[in-house]
Amino acid sequence: MLRLDTLNGHTLAVVYNFACHPIMGVPNGGNTADLTGFASKVIEDNLSAGTVALFVQGCGGDINPVRYKDVHQPRSAEPLGNVLGLSVLHAVRKIKCEAAAPLAVLNEKLRLPRADHSERIDTLLAEQSRSVKALKGTSLNLKTFLELANKYNLSQEFPSYYSHLYFTEKAQGRDDLLKLDEANRKNLRAYIENVVTMEKLTRVQTNLALLQKHQTTNRAAGRKPLEVEVAALRVGAFVLVTFPGELTVEVGLNIKRSSSHKTTFVAGYTNGYIYYTPTAEQLRNTGGAQEDSDCLVAPEWEQLFYTKVADLLKKL
């Protein structure tokens, strides 16, 4: 983070960098600045009057808030934002501002190779076809499935009626209820298999649409390299590198580990937007996540970016 003080020692601004999609939301479902908005309020309320807290998104392409899909309690970004804000305050009070801190700004162009998604598109089309063919008719609809699922989860041993009727049938040498349970359980399994297949199909179709969209864009560009701006900023010991893609966390960690500057920060989503930019390894080991498919660049982009960053950091 970066702390800027006025000459009289008051804090003018705090720039803080954190990696996470701000998608937690608030309980009433309204518009919100999310966890970073709450964090900025905590920071501004606890420093000099008029202090401005400025959030800079980090390498959050594959980072989401904990419990952001929770269905058992209202989802609120405020607790997470408060924790983030307190963490910033804890660190910012340790920073000592220097009147003669060096200032440097660099920005250069970088040409990145575009991806050819044709092989993955073919793979997903085949998977889509297999999934559709795997769907089979059952004797249940949603209403009867929910009724049976409730019954058979409430009572594993005697789901269809009270236990005494099962024992009566057994004493009479009959197994009507047992046969009914066997048939119902078979139909429940078949229905659940269809649901699982449909969930898989929605993921396949979502990723397929993303790949096809970016394949169309890249073909329209004639496979010309994608030109982006990479910038580097130094204010005293604070060093920030920027990139227009949704960088994943491993990219940021790699840059920090290799940097000769003690406090190096990385900002994605900056000076343009080129969708997700996963590591080369993530692009080779696709797992159905959005960042695997919502991507314009080829795996070689990563090393080119590291090389450019290393050059800029040396110049700072």
Roles of regions detected by a PLM:
Residues 1-316:
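Non-catalytic substrate/cofactor recognition surfaces at enzyme active-site rims
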